Curated annotation (Swiss-Prot):
<keyword id="KW-0677">Repeat</keyword>
<feature type="binding site">
    <location>
        <position position="138"/>
    </location>
    <ligand>
        <name>Ca(2+) 3</name>
    </ligand>
</feature>
<feature type="binding site">
    <location>
        <position position="63"/>
    </location>
    <ligand>
        <name>Ca(2+) 2</name>
    </ligand>
</feature>
<feature type="binding site">
    <location>
        <position position="140"/>
    </location>
    <ligand>
        <name>Ca(2+) 3</name>
    </ligand>
</feature>
<dbReference type="Pfam" id="PF13202">
    <property type="entry name" value="EF-hand_5"/>
</dbReference>
<dbReference type="InterPro" id="IPR011992">
    <property type="entry name" value="EF-hand-dom_pair"/>
</dbReference>
<feature type="binding site">
    <location>
        <position position="147"/>
    </location>
    <ligand>
        <name>Ca(2+) 3</name>
    </ligand>
</feature>
<feature type="binding site">
    <location>
        <position position="25"/>
    </location>
    <ligand>
        <name>Ca(2+) 1</name>
    </ligand>
</feature>
<dbReference type="GO" id="GO:0005654">
    <property type="term" value="C:nucleoplasm"/>
</dbReference>
<feature type="binding site">
    <location>
        <position position="23"/>
    </location>
    <ligand>
        <name>Ca(2+) 1</name>
    </ligand>
</feature>
<keyword id="KW-0479">Metal-binding</keyword>
<feature type="binding site">
    <location>
        <position position="70"/>
    </location>
    <ligand>
        <name>Ca(2+) 2</name>
    </ligand>
</feature>
<feature type="binding site">
    <location>
        <position position="61"/>
    </location>
    <ligand>
        <name>Ca(2+) 2</name>
    </ligand>
</feature>
<comment type="subunit">
    <text>Interacts with numA/nucleomorphin in the presence of Ca(2+).</text>
</comment>
<feature type="domain" description="EF-hand 1">
    <location>
        <begin position="10"/>
        <end position="45"/>
    </location>
</feature>
<feature type="domain" description="EF-hand 2">
    <location>
        <begin position="46"/>
        <end position="81"/>
    </location>
</feature>
<dbReference type="GO" id="GO:0005509">
    <property type="term" value="F:calcium ion binding"/>
</dbReference>
């Protein structure tokens, strides 16, 4: 499991590498021109738009440059957006089991989902039991989107821990 300290160290290293790659004048920041050149070098489709957007969003002190902390913020936001997108896709894919569309998966819906996914009845029961043991955190015999999301965050270690 990745700790917050390790995650932030990795983020800092990635930030330093990005700045190092684009910083032409050695001030440990990326100016608008340096950002543009970096994105152009990386063959971004519209480096002007990307540069202007990043500066607008993450140049917190509005000095026309991105500092290490501002770049870390940008990378962290990008990571969170990607993680949340993946989480939503994961939850949505599992919630195909919600046959009555009430935003809850019952044990029987889970079992039926596994059967229609190719498991035999015995396997489907085992899979449904396992799913409910792992995911139904409030033991109400239903799995909600939030329970599934929280399970995925923990199981796949999406966000770093203490």
């Amino acid at each position: 499991m990745v700790t917050k300290k390790e995650f932030l160290e990795d983020l800092t290293n990635a930030t330093n590498e990005m700045i190092k790659a684009g910083d032409k004048n050695g001030d440990n920041q990326l100016s608008k021109k340096e950002l543009y050149e970096l994105f152009k070098k990386c063959k971004y489709p519209n480096p002007t738009l990307v540069t202007n957007s990043l500066l607008e969003l993450f140049d917190l002190d509005k000095d026309g440059k991105l500092s290490v902390n501002e770049v870390k913020t940008a990378l962290l936001v990008d990571y969170i957006i990607e993680a949340e997108t993946c989480l939503k896709k994961f939850v949505d894919s599992i919630f195909k089991a919600d046959s009555n569309k009430d935003n809850k998966i019952t044990w029987d819906e889970a079992r039926q989902f596994f059967v229609t996914s190719g498991s035999n009845e015995a396997q489907a029961k085992v899979f449904a039991n396992s799913m409910f043991e792992d995911v139904d955190s409030d033991d109400d015999k239903c799995i909600t989107r939030e329970e599934l999301r929280e399970y995925a965050i923990e199981y796949y270690e999406i966000y770093p821990t203490e």
